From Swiss-Prot:
Annotated source species: Burkholderia ambifaria (strain ATCC BAA-244 / DSM 16087 / CCUG 44356 / LMG 19182 / AMMD) (Burkholderia cepacia (strain AMMD))
The protein's name in its UniProt record: HPr kinase/phosphorylase
Pfam families according to UniProt: Hpr_kinase_C, Hpr_kinase_N
Note, other: Both phosphorylation and phosphorolysis are carried out by the same active site and suggest a common mechanism for both reactions.
Cofactor(s) needed by this chain: Mg(2+)
Amino-acid biosynthesis keyword on record: no
UniProt keyword list: ATP-binding, Kinase, Magnesium, Metal-binding, Multifunctional enzyme, Nucleotide-binding, Serine/threonine-protein kinase, Transferase
Lineage: superkingdom: Bacteria
Binding site for ATP: 161-168
Length: 322
């Protein structure tokens, strides 16, 4: 992962308003950030932001009231030693939180070493929580997939398939039936948690849907505010195919999945043919997926019913289990 764009300046710009940050000194060190090794070795964003801790030198160090009080109780010699050790570790930047006054020696050393020093009236815990969430978002695995991403019955559904199969037309039909558009053509996905992938629309394509023969349609203007969504969690992939290939199964015994950013996402395959109402089929697939998420598997229930019928000697469907 390229971490060159993640530095003190970018983090300050993105969080200054939210965290009420002020840049006290060390402006020359605006390019300070995280090394690739530090990010690669971090198990989570918690490894990159935390309370003052000299054991983890390469993370963002936050000094709250407890840390400042501890510093004030030290002897001059211990203060100087701790400050020298802290600055020598070259953290990306320091934050003095809780409205506490930054110790003069800390300000002096940050100025001399070009170490960015921020201050904020917010508590250290609030600053750490916010920065951890921010870091987890910008460092999360990302991917851009081709397709139409929709909110169907509250579920994030990605329509995929070869060009010319009518994905955008199908998306338009589903939007006209009351569902919402997230993104068309290019969808930005990011894995923000261990069990979900979130999809958004690139800013350039916001609210737009391209339909052959009609060109670009502004869905928000045509259908209203409720016809578009800012983001959705990806739960289902619907692949459109022109004709079934050798792997197509009429009644798949096992659920199909597609790996997206290391997370298995449920997948259904629908054949595109004349006379088929694809919008109804997609809605049915979504409803069936919702049932499966609730533990209701229609195919498994039918197989159990069939097995019981074959085992019943009085059944009109006698058979022998293999």
């Amino acid at each position: 992962m390229d971490t060159s764009s993640i530095n003190a300046q970018s983090i300050f710009d993105d969080n200054a308003a939210t965290l009420k940050l002020s840049w006290l000194t060390g402006h020359e060190g605006w390019e300070r950030g995280f090394s690739s090794d530090t990010v690669a070795n971090a198990t989570s964003s918690a490894d990159l932001v935390g309370h003052l801790n000299l054991i983890h030198p390469n993370r963002i160090q936050v000094l709250g009231e407890a840390e400042i009080d501890y510093y004030q109780r030290q002897t001059d010699e211990d203060r100087s030693r701790h400050m020298a050790e802290l600055i020598a570790l070259e953290p990306p930047f320091l934050v003095v939180a809780g409205g506490a006054a930054a110790p003069p020696e800390l300000v002096l050393r940050c100025t001399r070493s070009s170490t960015p020093l921020f201050t904020t009236p917010m508590s250290a815990a609030a600053v750490i929580d916010s920065l951890r969430l921010y870091m987890s978002r910008i460092l999360a695995p990302r991917a851009t997939l081709h397709g139409v991403f929709l909110d169907i019955l509250g579920m994030g559904v990605l329509l995929t398939g070869d060009s010319g199969l009518g994905k955008s037309e199908l998306g338009l039909e589903l939007i006209s039936r009351g569902h919402g558009l997230v993104a068309d053509d290019a969808v930005d996905f990011v894995r923000l948690g261990p069990d979900f992938v979130e999809g958004r629309c690139p800013p350039l394509l916001q609210n737009l849907l391209e339909v052959r023969g009609l060109g670009l349609l502004d869905i928000k203007t045509i259908f209203g505010e409720t016809a578009v969504r800012r983001k959705m969690k990806l739960k289902l992939i619907v692949q459109l195919v022109r004709r079934p290939d050798g792997e197509f199964q009429r009644l798949p015994l096992e659920s199909q999945t597609v790996d997206v950013l290391g997370l298995p996402i449920s997948k259904v395959t629908i054949q595109v043919a004349a006379g088929r109402n694809l919008a109804v089929l997609v809605e049915a697939a979504v409803r069936n997926t919702i049932l499966q998420l609730r533990g209701i598997d229609t195919l498994r229930d039918f197989m159990d019913r069939q097995r019981l019928a074959m085992q019943d000697p009085d059944s009109q469907f006698p058979g022998k289990l293999v």
